[in-house]
């Protein structure tokens, strides 16, 4: 179908696809994955997010310049736990795809995310977010370039009613163009204060201790993160994304709902993308502010490029990615020196990395090899993670962890969930971190985290959702 057909035609096509899948399920005596996709008229997936998010149904919004989608409803959830979570999901996904019934231009796909560290501390506000949770969404609305599509997915079981399944999905398609629920903005809180003087001193003391550990040779780099917990008004997550879209067009936008909590952000960092056997990633480490004018901006950027401390920190990330990708690659392309990635408030050292993969083994094995890179964990990985578990004093949850999608043809894309916040009823948790090496300065690193927190604070404040007064909670 070139465009979403009239209801009767859509119902007939979906019924036929579901009948094939149910018949195959009966023959195999096990459930069978079914995916049916159609072209539709232009439609912004963000507006569907705004119309459909009911604050309980699992869903995920994702936006980059080349691809945006809203995935709603969980037809199947693949979970993994502990150190083998990536491998377990990969194994189950391959089994499902082997017998899948597919109709239309799109392959079956999963979307979701992972905890930063399954062995790390756990707090109640992250309870709904598993070690690994990738869902087969019932309905996904996509914009890819100039193409707009909808993907219907289900796990067909022997004896199911194909007509009832088709009618259910058609009824959802009829709601695609419902208007988004927009809540009026309350009073804007304006510029948000950061941590108290005592909390700042506590944070800088943690940084100082970590830097001392680097100098003592315990590890070459460690990343410490901190969180701010703030009272939160009654806001629509999609409106936060709408604001981030306007202010941070160069970032990767995401929002993932589990239960009554929504984790969202505007990340500058891709972990890895696979398309047609080619892997694309980058090393992103080393940070400085943007300038007030073009001349100051150029001066600050050059200072970052000339900084021995930041170049050393950056090179640790480059070498870790090289080591992780080499076993999977026929060709690995890494520039000799970094460039700059300029964002709205900060600029980073950035080295793009490409790999021609040796086989079609899938993206989850690359996630396991890459995560966490030294940009969000440290180097060496094991020693840095042990230090974070013992000294950071917070549950990162899905912060700084892989979040994205993969399909049944070996393609996929996962970002690193940075510049983010977890929204729960009545309160929001904002996250930021910084990489520490032997000559890091606590006051400078504190200011860096303030810059990184500012994007999400400003977005929440702009729609009237953030209270000026921090909750009385330690900053880590």
Swiss-Prot record:
Catalytic activity line of the entry: chorismate = isochorismate
Species the sequence originates in: Pseudomonas aeruginosa (strain ATCC 15692 / DSM 22644 / CIP 104116 / JCM 14847 / LMG 12228 / 1C / PRS 101 / PAO1)
Protein name according to UniProt: Salicylate biosynthesis isochorismate synthase
Region annotation Disordered: where it falls in the sequence: 181-202
Keywords: Isomerase
Pathway noted in the entry: Siderophore biosynthesis; salicylate biosynthesis
Record's function text: Involved in the conversion of chorismate to salicylate.
Classification via NCBIfam families: isochor_syn, PRK07054.1
Gene: pchA
EC number(s) given by UniProt: 5.4.4.2
């Amino acid at each position: 179908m070139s465009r979403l057909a009239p209801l009767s035609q859509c119902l007939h096509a979906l019924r036929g696809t579901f009948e094939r899948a149910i018949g195959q399920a009966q023959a195999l005596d096990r459930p069978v994955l079914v995916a049916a996709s159609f072209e539709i008229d232009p439609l912004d997936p963000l507006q569907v997010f705004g119309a459909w998010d009911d604050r309980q149904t699992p869903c995920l919004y994702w936006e980059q310049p080349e691809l945006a989608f809203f995935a709603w409803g969980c037809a199947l959830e693949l979970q993994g736990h502990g150190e083998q979570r990536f491998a377990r999901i990969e194994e189950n996904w391959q089994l499902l795809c082997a017998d899948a019934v597919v109709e239309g231009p799109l392959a079956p796909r999963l979307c979701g995310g992972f905890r930063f560290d399954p062995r790390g501390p756990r707090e109640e506000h992250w309870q709904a977010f598993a070690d690994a949770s990738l869902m087969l969404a019932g309905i996904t609305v996509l914009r890819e370039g100039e193409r707009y599509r909808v993907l219907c997915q289900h796990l067909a079981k022997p004896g199911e009613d194909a007509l009832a399944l088709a009618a259910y999905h058609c009824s959802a398609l009829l709601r695609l163009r419902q208007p988004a629920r927009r809540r009026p903005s309350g009073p804007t809180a304006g510029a948000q204060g950061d941590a108290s003087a005592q909390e700042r001193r506590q944070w800088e003391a943690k940084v100082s201790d970590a830097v001392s550990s680097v100098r003592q040779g315990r590890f070459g780099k460690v990343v410490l993160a901190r969180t701010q917990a703030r009272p939160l008004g009654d806001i629509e997550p999609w409106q936060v994304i709408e604001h981030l879209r306007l202010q941070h067009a160069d970032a990767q936008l995401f929002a993932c709902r589990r239960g009554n909590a929504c984790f969202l952000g505007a990340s500058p960092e891709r972990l890895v993308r696979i398309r047609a056997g080619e892997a694309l990633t980058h090393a992103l480490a080393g940070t400085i502010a943007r300038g007030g004018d073009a001349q100051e901006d150029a001066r600050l950027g050059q200072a970052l490029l000339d900084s021995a401390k930041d170049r050393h920190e950056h090179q640790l990330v480059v070498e870790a990615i090289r080591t992780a990708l080499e076993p999977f690659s026929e060709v690995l392309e890494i520039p000799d020196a970094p460039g700059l990635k300029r964002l709205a408030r900060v600029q980073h050292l950035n080295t793009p990395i490409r790999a021609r993969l040796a086989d079609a083994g899938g993206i989850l094995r690359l996630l396991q090899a890459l995560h966490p890179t030294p940009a969000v964990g440290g180097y060496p990985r094991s020693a840095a993670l042990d230090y974070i578990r013992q000294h950071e004093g917070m549950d990162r949850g899905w912060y700084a962890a892989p979040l994205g999608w993969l399909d049944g043809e070996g393609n996929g894309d996962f970002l690193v969930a940075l510049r983010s916040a977890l929204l729960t009823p009545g309160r929001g948790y904002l996250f930021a971190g910084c990489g520490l090496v032997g000559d890091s300065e606590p006051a400078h690193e504190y200011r860096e985290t303030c810059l990184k927190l500012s994007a999400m604070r400003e977005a929440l404040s702009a729609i009237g959702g953030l209270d000026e007064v921090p909750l009385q909670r330690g900053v880590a």
